[in-house]
Amino acid sequence: MRISYTPQQEELRRELRSYFATLMTPERREALSSVQGEYGVGNVYRETIAQMGRDGWLALGWPKEYGGQGRSAMDQLIFTDEAAIAGAPVPFLTINSVAPTIMAYGTDEQKRFFLPRIAAGDLHFSIGYSEPGAGTDLANLRTTAVRDGDDYVVNGQKMWTSLIQYADYVWLAVRTNPESSGAKKHRGISVLIVPTTAEGFSWTPVHTMAGPDTSATYYSDVRVPVANRVGEENAGWKLVTNQLNHERVALVSPAPIFGCLREVREWAQNTKDAGGTRLIDSEWVQLNLARVHAKAEVLKLINWELASSQSGPKDAGPSPADASAAKVFGTELATEAYRLLMEVLGTAATLRQNSPGALLRGRVERMHRACLILTFGGGTNEVQRDIIGMVALGLPRANR
């Protein structure tokens, strides 16, 4: 096994770093980091992504017929990591989870319409799965879609629909067979692509302590063409699980951790304690930084292994057990890593961005708050452990 970048991958990293240095101007970086809105001032989030799409980078790991460069999943991972290092926004759910599911299960017409627009950075998705009474128990969802001629009529409510303010469509799980119940309730689920401009669709913001906002979305007699159903009717559960497997891996890039580690290390090298000793020379500081570095390296290798095992975006993706294992390790590592880095910074590390005395622009504090949501976004880590036990270890299903 080669546990390093190939010469070609090193060249790609250099090319991407040069590209992002030009893309992320001081003005764009400042606008994206503003506390106004989840991803900065005005339309800078979508404009930045559209620029990456026009430049051909956003979907470089996709087949050329869909607007990509036909590169490997490893190259796509390198792009994701370099974007994170540069602070450039990437629509992970759209690019890395919804789009591969469309490639695997969508009709030719759906592929022709959605995929080139996603690759161009012009089309964004939100995920509509969780409901007030169906979060962890997703198969218990109650949002209905009733067939009426060439349309479905959708009624219901979803929770935790993130990035809805930027979305053109919602990837929506609905119940098309109300008769399914008990152990077979997952068999009555279908997936629809719902325009956010559809009559009867609305949403309200949900502000969180973690920092990133999310939303509640509402569907009141929303008419969705049958042509917008992905896969067969009542057979949407495999699409949901396929998308979630991709999502769980997309949540756990180590690049932001390495970025914060570098900033904290440099700060400790240039900051002295009350006795005049550099903080970096304290053993406990060195241990904290070393623990973060070592575990982030392990996460990087996990992602490399997952990317190397995929033949491309049309691949079925990681196994449920591998996706869940990466998600549990990566999200819990992030929480612990930012906590250890905040210990090094001291009490001022708890001050938020733009607060007087905030260290490193409040970046580590914000990342610590934001990463907490990842332990249950895409499926709670408790359920991920159940999946690992059942699929990888052959243990019986947990009683919940």
Swiss-Prot record:
Name of the protein this chain belongs to? Acyl-CoA dehydrogenase FadE26
Q: How is the cofactor bound here?
A: Binds 1 FAD per heterodimer.
Organism of this sequence:
Mycobacterium tuberculosis (strain ATCC 25618 / H37Rv)
**Keywords assigned by UniProt, alphabetized:** Cholesterol metabolism, FAD, Flavoprotein, Lipid degradation, Lipid metabolism, Oxidoreductase, Steroid metabolism, Sterol metabolism, Virulence
Task: Name the residues annotated as catalytic in the UniProt entry.
Answer: E247
Per its record, the protein catalyses:
(25S)-3-oxocholest-4-en-26-oyl-CoA + A = 3-oxo-cholest-4,24-dien-26-oyl-CoA + AH2
Q: In which pathway does it act?
A: Steroid metabolism; cholesterol degradation
Indicate how activity is controlled.
Uncompetitively inhibited by high concentration of 3-OCS-CoA.
What SUPFAM superfamilies does the annotation carry? Acyl-CoA dehydrogenase C-terminal domain-like (SSF47203), Acyl-CoA dehydrogenase NM domain-like (SSF56645)
Q: Where does FAD bind?
A: I127, G128, Y129, S130, T136, S162, T380, N381, E382
Q: What lineage is this protein's organism placed in? A: Bacteria, Bacillati, Actinomycetota, Actinomycetes, Mycobacteriales
